[in-house]
């Protein structure tokens, strides 16, 4: 079974027509996104994320290397048929209603009138806009435009969904609703490729991520593996100062969390001894767990090390 997305040594060089100066936006990107996966592409501004997506959509041609969609060359028109796309900056006609806009984009995708008639209300309800279908887009908020934009990308039931900042400007309730819809699509086997600066959203939703920096892959892997830390985290309440001093000497790091004292130990033995000491001092132990990092911490570390 071919990968949903696969690139091999992808290079893109932009040349200034006046100065002749070259800018290497992509410098040998090799990535594989398996069918049915949820994949997040991360990177600082100017890392090459947008250029990478443009090549997948055949809006730009690579200088070198190859990109395929479900085994077909990304430049092949047939490769784009199973793709649904939500750009970061979309410009839908403001005089259209949500319903008429979705109907229009469905027709561009080759959907029949009966199929569009059935699909439009289903999607409007799915993105929480069932009561706004007959309202002109000019009266939609930014978050509402993002949600109807997602519905547009889903009109023709794509096998691969490429989303560029899908929750930008969306309120917390709307984000939860969008995540729920995306999880449903994931369960249906849709491959979801997410390009976002919201690392917390990527961490909540994606199973696999790649961080690119200066046109190269700096790190890739499963989110759970990349955020797995080393050591053990012990959180306790009502810890006397004398006990804190004793544990500070053994703990790798210490801190405060929710009014409690947090200790991180390098190994299980130190953590067990700390728990025994806290219990003997009649402290309230709130939690003992493996230490972990957030995706944001991993991202910052990788970018600063490059």
What are the residue ranges of the model-derived segments?
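Conserved ABC transporter NBD signature motif
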Residues: 65-81
